[in-house]
Amino acid sequence: VIHPPRSLTKWQSTSFTYNMTRCGFFDTPAATGTQTITGLGFRPTFAMFFHSMQTTDGAEADACLNQGYAVEIASVITQHARSGRSQEGGIAGSTEYGSGASQTLCIRGNTTTTTLNLEAALTEFNDDGFVLNYTTVPAAATRVFYVAVLIESLGVGIIPSLALPFGVSTPVTGLSFQPQMVMGMHRGSDSCNLGFGTPGSEFSMMSRNRDDVAFGFSPEIWSSTGSVFLSGYGGRDDSVNLTAINADGFSVIKNLITDPRPDFYWLALADTAVSFAAGSFVPPQSGTTTITGLGFQPALLLLIGMQGIGISSAYNNQLGFRNFFGAVDSEGNQWCCGQNATTLASQPRYMSSTSATVRHGQLTNAHTFTFNEDGFDISTVVGAAGTATCAFLAFGARDSSGALPLLGVG
């Protein structure tokens, strides 16, 4: 990580880039209180967190994929967290525990009890990382993955599902900047869902809907190759699209819904010195696939993946990994966190990777990522049957020719 001096100004003739992005992981502490994460080499303004209540690579845990984020805007930290469910018993008649949301936490989750056993809030961004405060910790350590980025302009908010009219483009304004990328997050009946993009280039992931023997099957994944920003939790019966990027916000439209759904949290990003791009790809079964056309060399990829597009069958045709989140950065950090199921009769299980590979499909598929000047290369470490589709959000390194905020590093 290159730390530019404070005196650097954008009129200097030498142009270079420097990374203000990082992904990594940490394990939850044994006791409540503060935990300081260091080693980033810069002061982030935005951090996302993912976990599935377990630590060992490939381990199974009876809890769902959870996610949250924290942002700093005008010295004020705002954070949201969504937790999916844990369950016990067989697929039919499973009991749901702990699903929900928080507007005061960035990390939230539970195992097979009705009591939350992991709660943490981000209390400070500093020159080398961030500080978390735990009010509840699990008996066994949980591995939490994070993505941290310095972004110049950020906006956050909540759109109540019931307040969003059906079929009408609804503006979200008051940001004081024009977003380059918009993200959305909400909780499905099982797990947490994430979407990102710009109008006409939207990508979303969802978990399966709740088990119900009356239906005879479990709708699995709703994802998009470029047309849905946020999809709901009952199969494909709930979706929201971005319809416009405005000078001080964006517009959304609810175009498919059958009954009330969870509110969704949104996050808008813009930066005069950072490039953004979103897209999708199918990881290769063997060899290397090159993705180009981004127009810049990435410094960070945020990945959301699923075993198919719009699949609606018992446990995703039993292909394995139902959905996952992952991240890759230019420091060589690569990780994956998600959930899987092997057969209709099995419980959902969860795993993660902390090695230098992005794993999916019950660890039967593994890939490494390297960045090129116009995109990235995906190389197969382990390939197996079953096609996964990945959507990505790419962040470029900061460009010294753009406007520079105070970095807080010397």
What are these regions (language model features)?
Residues 14-410:
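Surface-exposed molecular-recognition determinants
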